[in-house]
């Protein structure tokens, strides 16, 4: 087997303006550690969440296609979930910059899954960017939808949204960056 295709690892080159995020979630010590990356672009981010509602909101905001979690960690979210058996002590070079050990475990679970299913060296991915919701003006997914920031309410398409009006980018990478900023 050369490559395993799953919802989070499928690469649709026709819709290159959209990210295809694969994520991992790890529950420990009353927190939910959440990491996600796009294996096509290498964009990688992670955060620490407090509640399942926060997790669900991050899934919807980032259009997560698949979530990897350790067996027996129950996640009640609306996303495709893949349970894996992973050694929580695995260490990847890409996560050495992360100071929180549980966040590092979460990122390592994701990187290990990518290596195993894609036969791909994870060194081509960017280092994980840690972000915290309380450091930014934060809008829930429902607010973003009602204000039609990235998609219209009529059919969920880009046309008629704020993004469609200000998007004058000439490359797919630029379009993804602008959407990330919004």
Language model segments and positions:
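Charged catalytic and DNA/RNA-contacting regions of genome-maintenance
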Residues: 1-182
């Amino acid at each position: 087997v050369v490559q395993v295709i799953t919802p989070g690892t499928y690469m649709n080159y026709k819709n290159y303006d959209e990210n295809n995020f694969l994520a991992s979630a790890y529950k420990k010590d009353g927190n939910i550690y959440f990491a996600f990356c796009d294996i096509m672009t290498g964009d990688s981010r992670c955060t620490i969440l407090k509640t399942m509602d926060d997790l669900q909101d991050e899934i919807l905001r980032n259009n997560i296609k698949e979530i990897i979690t350790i067996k027996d960690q129950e996640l009640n979210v609306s996303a495709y979930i893949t349970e894996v058996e992973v050694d929580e002590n695995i260490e990847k070079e890409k996560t050495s910059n992360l100071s929180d050990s549980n966040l590092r475990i979460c990122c390592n679970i994701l990187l290990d899954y990518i290596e195993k299913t894609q036969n791909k060296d994870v060194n081509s991915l960017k280092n994980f960017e840690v972000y915290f919701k309380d450091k930014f003006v934060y809008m829930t997914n429902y607010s973003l939808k009602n204000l039609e920031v990235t998609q219209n309410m009529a059919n969920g398409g880009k046309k008629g949204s704020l993004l469609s009006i200000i998007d004058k980018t000439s490359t797919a990478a630029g379009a993804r960056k602008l959407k990330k900023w919004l």
